[in-house]
Amino acid sequence: MDEAETDATENKRASEAKRASAMPPPPPPPPPISPPALIPAPAAGEEGPASLGQAGAAGCSRSRPPALEPERSLGRLRGRFEDYDEELEEEEEMEEEEEEEEEMSHFSLRLESGRADSEDEEERLINLVELTPYILCSICKGYLIDATTITECLHTFCKSCIVRHFYYSNRCPKCNIVVHQTQPLYNIRLDRQLQDIVYKLVINLEEREKKQMHDFYKERGLEVPKPAAPQPVPSSKGKTKKVLESVFRIPPELDMSLLLEFIGANEDTGHFKPLEKKFVRVSGEATIGHVEKFLRRKMGLDPACQVDIICGDHLLERYQTLREIRRAIGDTAMQDGLLVLHYGLVVSPLKIT
């Protein structure tokens, strides 16, 4: 029994050894994978390494796909991020352009609406009554003719109205400011722009005024004055051409020329400034009171000082006008076309304390 059992055991071992020898040997274990060397990314214009498709895919050749180099993967990721950033920038630029176009469209709409509003305002009719206070003369209560403005207060009147007013007063008819102590006509100027506005606002006003002026001169047998035309500028080469008259012309209202001669002062008058210019041109409607005020202001006289003005042998009163004095005294008061007035300074006995 023991021998039979040992034979069976040996036979079994022999059959197992045959089976084992008939089976193919197991494949060797794969070698350990070492980290690949860092390969720099290809420069622009150079050909890079073969792609995965060229080396063979794992599904067709059972070969293990090569590991991706870190540098190449980083370069591709950077390229992808750069492309994505460029796309984002392009999208942002497109959005900004669209927003600008929308703003410009809104702005153009506002401009068009503003233009429409301005055109409506320009076409809006204004009642002439609203502008009447600005184009009327406060003296004659009519429309301004030959609009003349006072330079001290900028109030405007008809030329004839304000000149006639200054015959009796040296103050503005509106604000009562002193225009000039002795010669208010020096501080008025023609306002041609305002006169043009008046003529454009009031229909046929200019034509009616010209017709009335023409009829006025024609009824009295006088020559109708022609409008002033600009004179040609003389050539510097032509010696035979006449020299044009001076641009400065004395207003016809200032028709009286004075010669103021100082005859002396008593000892109690104190200090005073001498009169620098003794030749004065004024209106014939100016009074001796105006001349006295002129002398006081120019010479800086004390209020206690009295000014006596004499023409010939006559002591003149403050209310007398220069035209009346010339008419009353005659040519004896004249010297080379000048009205000679002598003045002296004394201290008033009523003001001595």
UniProtKB/Swiss-Prot annotation:
Record PTM: Phosphorylated during mitosis.
| Coiled-coil intervals, chain numbering | 71-112
User: What are this entry's molecular-function GO terms?
Assistant: protein domain specific binding; zinc ion binding
Zinc finger intervals, RING-type: 137-176
Q: Where in the cell is it found?
A: Nucleus
Numbered residues of crosslink Glycyl lysine isopeptide (Lys-Gly) (interchain with G-Cter in SUMO2): 226, 237
Name of the protein this chain belongs to: Polycomb group RING finger protein 6
- Gene name as annotated: Pcgf6
